[in-house]
């Protein structure tokens, strides 16, 4: 599974459970105009519940990862008597017959045969030789054991092995009877050992009210070090791999351990029969990678909004949403009023909304467990009412929440409407200190004059052809010069060679 598909999978789950947003909890905010330069520390991505005012308890949780399709190895051991019968009547010839009769195997003998196979000293007795006596019927037998590798499946909910050849289809022991009563299945593994291969132990912190053993546990949640959140709301108790534990609404299961989890476990209802548990998908490394990737993307989007503000470019509601904190607690809040960007300080609380367009921003205050409206301060700006961090009330009277691309929001026409957001220049701020015009960017495919582009292309080819021609002429001249040198050297050697007299000239003397 790729990272992008995993992000989409997480967003799909979140959309089914509600969209989390962070809203200011305070009603009286002191607004001040934003001063240039806009120096703002972009918030990191959190997407985690608000932990403000809640008690924290460190604990170690044991939770199943993805159960692989690997089977549990073992052996089928079969025992039988191999008989040879000799029928030698006084009145006729000998008749030899062979037969195999299954018997119940013994565990010790099966283990001995398995060890012999592992050591490479297997024995095959086969049928014994016949033993014939006149006027008699004689039978000789060998007890033969056969073992073959055979893997079965682990069923973690019931904590047993399953195979269609088992009596009843399931077994919990290291030695299991098979159909026919003449074969047994033997393994060195145990259910606990196989389950332990898929159970991971991770540190976490449980937040919430003091666990008093009543319905207040529903507001508690656990955040582990891999940023996974386990909410106790809608949880139930069930066994998994023969261990008591708590199954959460999103499918996660954690083993009941001593302390706080035991108190909560005893007060949650039991799960209905057939309840399934989901393992962690994907692995821990990819979970951390996705979390860090979201951090980088949202930080980049926030920095883009800061650049627009300092250059006094027009902003959209989506741009302002990138400045909003991604985690509860103390932080900055922004709004546009009369064309001026203003900033204040507040405490954020996480609530969940059904979608990007809602009637009101209602939610439950975790500090009081009371439901209330968190924001009702709207400033008229043209045809819409500006709220906070890009949240506004549109022409339809409904509240529009600009969910950014990380939260997979729906961008409508009003969200894309750009508006001027002036900021007040600081008297000691020199705008010339930051000039993007001074930064050189190489040509990266931007549009230009097509005539100039063609002329540059043709002139470039002309220069290349001229260089190629000059290189070719130089190579030809060098070749001719080498040939001349070789010819001159040959002629000089020939002129120095002494003349020889023939036998005819010597005979005339």
From Swiss-Prot:
Query: What does UniProt say on post-translational modification here?
Result: Glycosylated by host.
Question: Which Pfam families does this one have?
Answer: Rhabdo_glycop_CD, Rhabdo_glycop_FD
Q: Name one GO biological process term.
A: fusion of virus membrane with host endosome membrane
Q: Where is the short sequence motif basolateral targeting ex vivo located?
A: 496-505
Record-annotated membrane-spanning stretches: 462-482
Query: What is the membrane topology listed in the Swiss-Prot or TrEMBL record?
Result: Single-pass type I membrane protein
Q: Which GO terms describe its cellular component?
A: host cell membrane; membrane; viral envelope; virion membrane
Alphabetical UniProt keywords? Clathrin-mediated endocytosis of virus by host, Disulfide bond, Fusion of virus membrane with host endosomal membrane, Fusion of virus membrane with host membrane, Glycoprotein, Host membrane, Host-virus interaction, Lipoprotein, Membrane, Palmitate, Signal, Transmembrane, Transmembrane helix, Viral attachment to host cell, Viral envelope protein, Viral penetration into host cytoplasm, Virion, Virus endocytosis by host, Virus entry into host cell
Xref: InterPro entries: Rhabdo_glycop_CD (IPR055447), Rhabdo_glycop_FD (IPR001903)
Keyword Signal attached: yes
Signal peptide region: 1-18
Covalently attached lipid (S-palmitoyl cysteine), positions: 488
Subcellular compartments: Virion membrane; Host membrane
Q: How does it assemble?
A: Homotrimer.
Recorded protein name is: Glycoprotein
Give the species. Spring viremia of carp virus
Starting at the broadest rank, the lineage of the source organism is: Viruses, Riboviria, Orthornavirae, Negarnaviricota, Haploviricotina
């Amino acid at each position: 599974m790729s990272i992008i598909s995993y992000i989409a999978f997480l967003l799909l789950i979140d959309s089914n459970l509600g969209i989390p947003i962070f809203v200011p909890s305070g009603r009286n905010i002191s607004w001040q105009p934003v001063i240039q330069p806009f120096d703002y520390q972009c918030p990191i991505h959190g997407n985690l519940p608000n932990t403000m005012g809640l008690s924290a308890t460190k604990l170690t949780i044991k939770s199943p990862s993805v159960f692989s399709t690997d089977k549990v190895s073992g052996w089928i051991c079969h025992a039988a008597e191999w008989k040879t019968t000799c029928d030698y009547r006084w009145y006729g010839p000998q008749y030899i017959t062979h037969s195999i009769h299954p018997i119940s195997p013994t565990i010790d003998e099966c283990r001995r045969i398995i060890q012999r196979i592992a050591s490479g000293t297997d024995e095959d007795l086969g049928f014994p030789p016949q033993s014939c006596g006149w006027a008699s019927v004689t039978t000789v037998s060998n007890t033969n054991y056969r073992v073959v590798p055979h893997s079965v499946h682990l069923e973690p909910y019931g904590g047993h092995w399953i195979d269609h050849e088992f009596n009843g289809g399931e077994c919990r022991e290291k030695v299991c009877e098979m159909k026919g009563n003449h074969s047994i299945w033997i393994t060195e593994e145990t259910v606990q050992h196989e389950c332990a291969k898929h159970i991971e132990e991770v540190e976490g912190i449980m937040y919430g009210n003091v666990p008093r053993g009543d319905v207040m546990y529903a507001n508690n949640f656990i955040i582990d070090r891999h940023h996974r959140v386990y909410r106790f709301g809608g949880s139930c108790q069930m066994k998994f791999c023969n261990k008591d534990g708590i199954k959460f609404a999103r499918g996660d299961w954690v083993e009941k351990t001593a302390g706080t989890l035991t108190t909560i476990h005893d007060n949650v209802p039991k799960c209905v029969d057939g309840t399934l548990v989901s393992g962690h998908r994907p692995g821990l490394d990819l979970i951390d990678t996705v979390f860090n990737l979201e951090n980088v993307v949202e930080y980049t989007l926030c920095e883009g909004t800061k650049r627009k503000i300092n250059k006094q470019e027009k902003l959209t509601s989506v741009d302002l949403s990138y400045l909003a904190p991604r985690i509860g607690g103390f932080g900055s809040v922004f709004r546009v009023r009369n064309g001026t960007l203003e900033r204040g300080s507040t405490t954020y609380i996480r609530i969940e909304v059904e979608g990007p367009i809602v009637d009101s921003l209602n939610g439950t205050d975790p500090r009081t467990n009371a439901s209330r409206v968190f924001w009702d301060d709207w400033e008229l700006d043209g045809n819409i009412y500006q709220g906070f961090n890009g949240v506004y009330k549109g022409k339809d009277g409904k509240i529009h929440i600009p969910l950014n691309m990380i939260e997979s929001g729906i961008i409508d026409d009003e969200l894309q409407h750009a508006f001027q957001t002036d900021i007040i220049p600081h008297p000691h701020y020199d705008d010339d200190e930051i000039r993007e015009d001074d930064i050189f960017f190489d040509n990266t495919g931007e549009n230009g004059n097509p005539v100039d582009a063609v002329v540059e292309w043709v002139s470039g080819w002309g220069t290349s052809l001229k260089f190629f021609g000059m290189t070719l002429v130089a190579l030809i001249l060098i070749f001719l010069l080498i040939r001349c040198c070789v010819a001159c050297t040959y002629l000089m050697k020939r002129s120095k060679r002494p003349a020889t007299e023939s036998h005819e000239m010597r005979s005339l003397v």
